Regions:
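C-terminal cap of thioredoxin/glutaredoxin-like
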Residues: 1-9, 17, 28, 148-218
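N-terminal targeting signals for export/organelle localization
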Residues: 1-44
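A short beta-strand-turn-helix
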Residues: 46-64, 88, 177
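Acidic/His-rich structured neighborhood in mature extracellular/periplasmic domains
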Residues: 47, 72-76
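Envelope-exposed proteins and targeting segments
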Residues: 62-65, 70, 92, 194
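Structural alpha/beta surface segment adjacent to cysteine/selenocysteine redox centers
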Residues: 67, 78-151, 181-186, 217-218
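Short pre-active-site segment immediately N-terminal to redox-active cysteine/selenocysteine motifs
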Residues: 70-73, 187
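Solvent-exposed coil/turn segments that connect beta secondary-structure elements
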Residues: 71-72, 99-102, 196, 203
Length: 218
C-alpha cells in the first residue's frame, strides 16, 4: 500500500517520466493509425486512383499520385491551392486527382455540382479553368455567380445549369462521400500521397518531403 501511495508523489517529483510516457503513447497511437490508413488505402486503391468522374491533372504518367479531397468554401483548401499548384508544376512527375468533397453547406454543394458539370460537358481543361476561378472567388457562391463564370469562359450556361442536377453529377459526389467515409476522412483538405494519407493542410515544403519519401520507398 505504501508503494501505491508514493507513486503519485514520485510522478510529481519526476514529471518528465509522465511526459515521456505520454510521448511514447502518442507515437504508438500515430503508428497504429498510420497502419490502419495504409491497409485501408491498399484495400480501396482501385477506387481511389482510378479517378472515375474526377479531374486528373499534372503528369498523367507521373510516378507519384496525389489525391486531394477538397471543398471550395474551405479556407485551408484555398490556402493549400497555390502550394499544390506549385508542387505539381515544379516537380513535373506528379499525377494529381481532385475529388470534389463538398461538406461545408449548400454553397459548397452548388460549386461542386457546377465544377463536375463543366468537367462532364466541357472537358478537363474547362474544369481546370473553373477550378482556378472557384478557388479564388470572393463573396458568396450562388447560381448567378456561377452562371457569370460559365458565361465569361464561353461555356453553354443553360446546358451546365441543367447538368448540375443530373444523376451523373450526383453520383460523383455520392461516390466521393462514400469513399471519404470508408477512409475516415471527415474534413478538408485531406491528401493521399501514394500510400500515405494526411488529413488537414500540408505546407509546400512538407508536401515535397512526403513526395521525396514516397519516391525513396519505391
Amino acid at each position: 500500500r505504501r508503494a501505491d501511495v508514493l507513486r503519485p508523489a514520485r510522478l510529481l517529483d519526476n514529471p518528465e517520466v509522465l511526459v515521456e510516457a505520454m510521448k511514447i503513447y502518442e507515437e504508438r497511437q500515430q503508428a497504429a493509425a498510420a497502419e490502419r490508413d495504409s491497409a485501408m488505402l491498399q484495400m480501396l486503391s482501385e477506387r481511389i486512383f482510378a479517378a472515375e468522374g474526377d479531374w486528373v491533372g499534372g503528369n498523367p504518367d507521373g510516378d507519384i499520385t496525389i489525391v486531394e479531397f477538397m471543398d471550395y468554401r474551405c479556407g485551408y483548401c484555398r490556402r493549400a491551392y497555390p502550394e499544390v499548384e506549385q508542387l505539381v508544376a515544379s516537380d513535373g512527375n506528379i499525377r494529381l486527382i481532385v475529388k470534389e468533397f463538398p461538406i461545408l453547406g449548400e454553397q459548397s454543394v452548388l460549386a461542386a455540382r457546377f465544377a463536375i458539370a463543366v468537367l462532364q460537358l466541357e472537358g478537363p481543361d474547362a474544369y481546370k479553368a473553373v477550378h482556378d476561378e472557384l478557388m479564388t472567388m470572393q463573396g458568396d457562391i450562388n447560381e448567378l455567380s456561377l452562371e457569370l463564370v460559365a458565361d465569361d469562359l464561353g461555356f453553354d450556361v443553360d446546358a451546365i445549369v441543367a447538368r448540375m442536377q443530373d444523376d451523373a453529377v450526383t453520383r460523383v459526389i455520392a461516390a466521393n462521400h462514400d469513399l471519404a467515409q470508408q477512409l475516415q476522412i471527415n474534413g478538408t483538405p485531406s491528401f493521399i500521397f501514394g500510400d500515405e494519407m494526411v488529413r488537414g493542410y500540408v505546407p509546400l515544403e512538407a508536401m515535397r518531403q512526403i513526395v521525396a519519401e514516397e519516391r525513396a520507398e519505391g
